[in-house]
Amino acid sequence: MSKSENLYSAARELIPGGVNSPVRAFTGVGGTPLFIEKADGAYLYDVDGKAYIDYVGSWGPMVLGHNHPAIRNAVIEAAERGLSFGAPTEMEVKMAELVTNLVPTMDMVRMVNSGTEATMSAIRLARGFTGRDKIIKFEGCYHGHADCLLVKAGSGALTLGQPNSPGVPADFAKHTLTCTYNDLASVRAAFEQYPQEIACIIVEPVAGNMNCVPPLPEFLPGLRALCDEFGALLIIDEVMTGFRVALAGAQDYYGVVPDLTCLGKIIGGGMPVGAFGGRRDVMDALAPTGPVYQAGTLSGNPIAMAAGFACLNEVAQPGIHETLDELTTRLAEGLLEAAEEANIPLVVNHVGGMFGIFFTDAESVTYYQDVMACDVERFKRFFHLMLEEGVYLAPSAFEAGFMSVAHSEEDINNTIDAARRVFAKL
């Protein structure tokens, strides 16, 4: 047995499923998950000593690559001053100033510890601000594991074949309306059915938890218009897309102005950080200035703030997002070319530093049903054969891939060459 197999066997006796987040268990592809010893640049190194070109990037945060010296040094320097204070720090102010400067729609920002905390808190704030209870989310989108959001959830719940998670009371779920991503008619129908009851829409601007599905040109502006028409707030969940699709996020890339924005992943530089923010009048409703309660023992943790501040300063450097886009486009085009040579039907969606691989005869993948019609079994074989080639993709047909600026042209070419060999075996 490999060391990963031994560790996984031991882990399953101690940790549910052997992992601390379900998708890591390889449930969506089968087999034994890799146990990682270290990472550097574009590469992961497992406990058995094998190196992999990494397109998971810790599920999104590692836009600069692993073990970036600026982030590492910032963490070391901050740790020397103490690990946690439970009191305000100067770095929290600097971080808030940086985030609100980079994302102009955020007049104010509140730091939390995860993307789930960010979305959960933003929805509570929207409900408190509007005095309404119902929310709209979209089938196949994932916004964390809060009860009100695990209703026809995407991501791991798709892989597990559970459109609704057990443990979510029906009384919670009844306030969550699930519409069809990229279908404005379904959203209008929800508003017309409950014109005075919907507090907010929460949406991934690029659906990254049913692989990678970009919005149709009219979709996000249409959501903005519907929120304005019916007096609801628009929450854009940029936990995945923030600072990756564009410096100011997918909202800037697609030209839509939300009332609230949720951030995570890149904002922490690899540390556990989330944030939510937006219009000043809405944020003023948050405790302690307003009646909507939210708190966190480790929110604004000095180590996490130092990591995030260093990361965002690097991400804001000129050329970063152009490089991300160029590398991702090169990979997508190379995979399509290699698949065509092998007569393998393939669609590759990509936006900025995100991409999605779909085995399908369809010309495009735009809707939830398009994703669900893809050949998951072929993806499983593709995943394992690529892993043997030293390429680590997301271990699920329903998760996006992530590029970093640490990936080189050689890494991209080696990945395409590996895919060419794998396609010949499928």
Curated annotation (Swiss-Prot):
GO terms for molecular function: glutamate-1-semialdehyde 2,1-aminomutase activity; pyridoxal phosphate binding; transaminase activity. It is found in: Cytoplasm. Pathway: Porphyrin-containing compound metabolism; protoporphyrin-IX biosynthesis; 5-aminolevulinate from L-glutamyl-tRNA(Glu): step 2/2. Keywords: Cytoplasm, Isomerase, Porphyrin biosynthesis, Pyridoxal phosphate. It catalyses: (S)-4-amino-5-oxopentanoate = 5-aminolevulinate. InterPro entries: 4pyrrol_synth_GluAld_NH2Trfase (IPR004639), Aminotrans_3 (IPR005814), Aminotrans_3_PPA_site (IPR049704), PyrdxlP-dep_Trfase (IPR015424), PyrdxlP-dep_Trfase_major (IPR015421), PyrdxlP-dep_Trfase_small (IPR015422). Its EC number is 5.4.3.8. Its cofactor is pyridoxal 5'-phosphate. The modification N6-(pyridoxal phosphate)lysine is found at K265. GO terms for cellular component: cytoplasm. It is an enzyme of class 5 (isomerase). It comes from the Bacteria. SUPFAM superfamilies: PLP-dependent transferases (SSF53383). The keyword Cytoplasm applies. GO terms for biological process: protoporphyrinogen IX biosynthetic process. Belongs to the class-III pyridoxal-phosphate-dependent aminotransferase family. HemL subfamily. PANTHER family: GLUTAMATE-1-SEMIALDEHYDE 2,1-AMINOMUTASE (PTHR43713), GLUTAMATE-1-SEMIALDEHYDE 2,1-AMINOMUTASE 1, CHLOROPLASTIC-RELATED (PTHR43713:SF3). Homodimer. This is Glutamate-1-semialdehyde 2,1-aminomutase. It comes from Salmonella paratyphi B (strain ATCC BAA-1250 / SPB7). The gene is hemL.
